[in-house]
């Protein structure tokens, strides 16, 4: 139990800090359209695709690794609440097209990135780069 909590906490600390950095770097470039949230969600979706495929191939890994990567790191990196707040802010400001576009880009893009992550793992496996 304690090892699981430590794994989740350590992963969450790393993921949250990366999300904060992405926001600081990218949102300064385009403050009207906060790309930090989108980058965090798309990166997290791509990485979870890789993680899903990797953990399926390595069932012998301790469950703490999955907790560290998926629950901790990726759970803290990706942000449904910030995405929701940003889209709701657009709706409140009457920017309906921007809100609907943002929703479509976040959701469809995240699904596509998860599929791309799974495909990335498959391609690396075929190249012999990982999991022989």
Swiss-Prot record:
Keywords: Cell inner membrane, Cell membrane, Ion channel, Ion transport, Membrane, Metal-binding, Sodium, Transmembrane, Transmembrane helix, Transport. The keyword Membrane applies. Pfam families: CRCB. Disulfide bonds: none annotated. Na(+) binds at residues 75, 78. InterPro entries: FluC. It comes from the Bacteria. One of its GO terms (biological process) is cellular detoxification of fluoride. It catalyses: fluoride(in) = fluoride(out). It is found in: Cell inner membrane. It is a multi-pass membrane protein. Na(+) is not transported, but it plays an essential structural role and its presence is essential for fluoride channel function. The chain crosses the membrane at residues 5-25, 36-56, 68-88, 103-123. One of its GO terms (cellular component) is plasma membrane. One of its GO terms (molecular function) is fluoride channel activity. Belongs to the fluoride channel Fluc/FEX (TC 1.A.43) family. Fluoride-specific ion channel. Important for reducing fluoride concentration in the cell, thus reducing its toxicity. This is Fluoride-specific ion channel FluC. It comes from Chromohalobacter salexigens (strain ATCC BAA-138 / DSM 3043 / CIP 106854 / NCIMB 13768 / 1H11). The gene is fluC.
């Amino acid at each position: 139990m304690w090892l699981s909590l430590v794994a989740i906490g350590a992963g969450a600390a790393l993921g949250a800090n990366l999300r904060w950095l992405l926001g600081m770097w990218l949102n300064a470039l385009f403050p009207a359209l906060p790309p930090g949230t989108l980058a965090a969600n798309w990166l997290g979706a791509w990485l979870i695709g890789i993680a899903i495929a990797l953990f399926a191939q390595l069932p012998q890994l301790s469950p703490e690794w999955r907790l560290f990567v998926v629950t901790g790191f990726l759970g803290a990196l990706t942000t449904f609440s910030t995405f929701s707040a940003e889209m709701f802010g657009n709706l409140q400001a009457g920017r309906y097209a921007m809100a609907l576009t943002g929703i479509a880009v976040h959701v469809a893009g995240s699904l596509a990135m998860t599929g791309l992550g799974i495909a990335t793992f498959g391609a690396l496996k075929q190249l012999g780069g990982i999991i022989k």
